[in-house]
Amino acid sequence: MLQTLQQQGLRHVVLCPGSRSGPLALAAAGLMRAGLITLSTAIDERSAGFYALGRSSASGVATAVITTSGTAVANLLPAAVEADRSSQPLLLISADRPLRLKNKGANQTVNQEAFLTPVCRWCGSGPLDGLSAGLDQELQALAQNAWRHLHQQPGPVHLNLPFEEPLHPDLDQQSTFWSQWNSSESVAITHNPELCKPTSHSEAPSLDPDQPGVIVAGPWRGLSATLEPYQAALIAWQQRSGWPVLADPLAAIPSNLGGVIRSWDLLLPNGLSQLPANAQVLRLGSMPASRRLEAWIANQQGPQLLITEGDPRPLDPLEIAEQWSGGLAQWWKQLNPRLRVIDATKPDIEARGGSPLQAWRTADLELQQRLYELLPGHGPANEPALMFALARLLPAELPVMLAASSPVRDWQAFAASDTGRRRCYSFRGASGIDGTLSLALGIAAELGPTVLITGDLALLHDSNGWLLASAAQQPLLVLLIDNAGGGIFEQLPIETTPRDGFNQLFAMPQQVDPLALAAAHSIPVRQLACLDDLPSALEWGLGSAGPTLLRVCTDRSSDAQLRRNLRKALQQSKSLS
């Protein structure tokens, strides 16, 4: 079964400990020794699931997790939920007890086959009385079905395999099997690569590029194989229409895309000149993490089209856009040829049809200049200034992962000058903070040197990720913004009496030394004294061959007020009004 998965594209397996899963462990080890897959181990199934999800997201190809029976399977649910909502392939393989032991009080025997069903694209099972010899064709078919469902509409797939005892062959049996096994033997693969392309059975709706409009690019949720065609289609439509682009940091837009308004988050709601009443909105993927943008989109009166990369589920919380799931590249191809040709005899495309592009560009550049004045790169660290500095100091094209709380929002607002220079990741399908470190380690395993920007609670929540970091030695710089609790709650209209109740009920600061915790896992650590030291600290962290932790202490209350003051100052700026 594993060999069939490998021949379809499986490259990496994450193995968790267990006895019932022993046959799967031995099979995976055999493929690893033959050089067919790579293998890593993790004692925490929740961490393993997120690590595999990070690898899948970075590579665009499903990574597999193998677990034993019982609560081990339940611990895969958080990663499966995120894989489902963010449309990423994730293969979850669990060993189980045979049917004869179910619902009889047998040890470590639960109805695990149903645990992941609500969020999986497909759930497959081996024979309920246990796997046995002579089932090669059935297992190959099971593997092929799993791989097809993983990538046809990307998401999690669960294979539950009951095993009857005896579970563990002796050394002579193992030696005999591997000596006769043919690692190059191929099976008939019925998987069709075309199934991995976004599809829609409806005719593609059109917009009018000769009329005013705006492009809103949300988080990219397609496979790596479809990213380049997506980017090419995005460039083509923007060149044809001249529309401005408001892009989420996770949108994976190309660096040569025209019309990008980088500081839209700080310019909204009053810093962008009003669109004509009939302006169209082309929305790509899910909504960016901005309530200001969501409110602004809701106020637009013209036609709206939402295009997803193969996800047919409703993705418009505003319920005002027509949705099409065939993918942007296919949409561009299906447009009337007349709509895909720029007429050189017409006036400059930025001036046609009341396009606001030039005015928005001017406001964007002026706001960026104001940020240089308002956020100097020296003195004590604060979160807006830190993000603004990181956008300039981090090497271009170095991947960045942003924890799904304050970091992704602050990057969107204050690191906007970085838009299009690098791939940014943040797992906002379900927007949980669990698995943050493990996800980043998975990304680094696939892409090489990576930076994780996280808060203290998100890092502590996945502290078992340090076990993976210590063992795998991935080149990951963890930049910890330690503001003693949940800083995101300081930015919400939450009031408590007395004030101390806010910490107890919402911020929940923890009395843990993150430097000591990382050092206990043999992770090199460093504390940032001030913003002046940031360049040398980044050089230290990025110069390491393995994981490192750089801690930056900030004040969440004063930083929340600073954000409000910055937005007010920028909105009141004469040059931007």
Curated annotation (Swiss-Prot):
Copy the pathway line from the protein's UniProt record.
Answer: Quinol/quinone metabolism; 1,4-dihydroxy-2-naphthoate biosynthesis; 1,4-dihydroxy-2-naphthoate from chorismate: step 2/7; Cofactor biosynthesis; phylloquinone biosynthesis
Q: Which UniProt keywords apply?
A: Magnesium, Manganese, Metal-binding, Thiamine pyrophosphate, Transferase
Question: Which reaction is this enzyme known to catalyze?
Answer: isochorismate + 2-oxoglutarate + H(+) = 5-enolpyruvoyl-6-hydroxy-2-succinyl-cyclohex-3-ene-1-carboxylate + CO2
Statement: the UniProt record of this protein carries the keyword ATP-binding: no
Enzyme class, first EC level, given as a word: transferase
Q: Which note does the record give on the cofactor?
A: Binds 1 thiamine pyrophosphate per subunit.
UniProt cross-references to InterPro entries, sorted A to Z: MenaQ_synth_MenD, MenD_middle, THDP-binding, Thiamin_PyroP_enz_TPP-bd_dom, TPP_enzyme_TPP-bd
Disulfide bridge positions per record = none
Required cofactor(s): Mg(2+); Mn(2+); thiamine diphosphate
The record's annotation in Pfam families points to: TPP_enzyme_C, TPP_enzyme_M_2, TPP_enzyme_N
Single Gene Ontology BP annotation: phylloquinone biosynthetic process
EC nos: 2.2.1.9
Q: How does it assemble?
A: Homodimer.
What HAMAP family has UniProt attached to this entry?
MenD
What job does the chain carry out? Answer: Catalyzes the thiamine diphosphate-dependent decarboxylation of 2-oxoglutarate and the subsequent addition of the resulting succinic semialdehyde-thiamine pyrophosphate anion to isochorismate to yield 2-succinyl-5-enolpyruvyl-6-hydroxy-3-cyclohexene-1-carboxylate (SEPHCHC).
Identify this protein by name.
Answer: 2-succinyl-5-enolpyruvyl-6-hydroxy-3-cyclohexene-1-carboxylate synthase
| Naturally occurring in which organism (per UniProt) | Synechococcus sp. (strain CC9311)
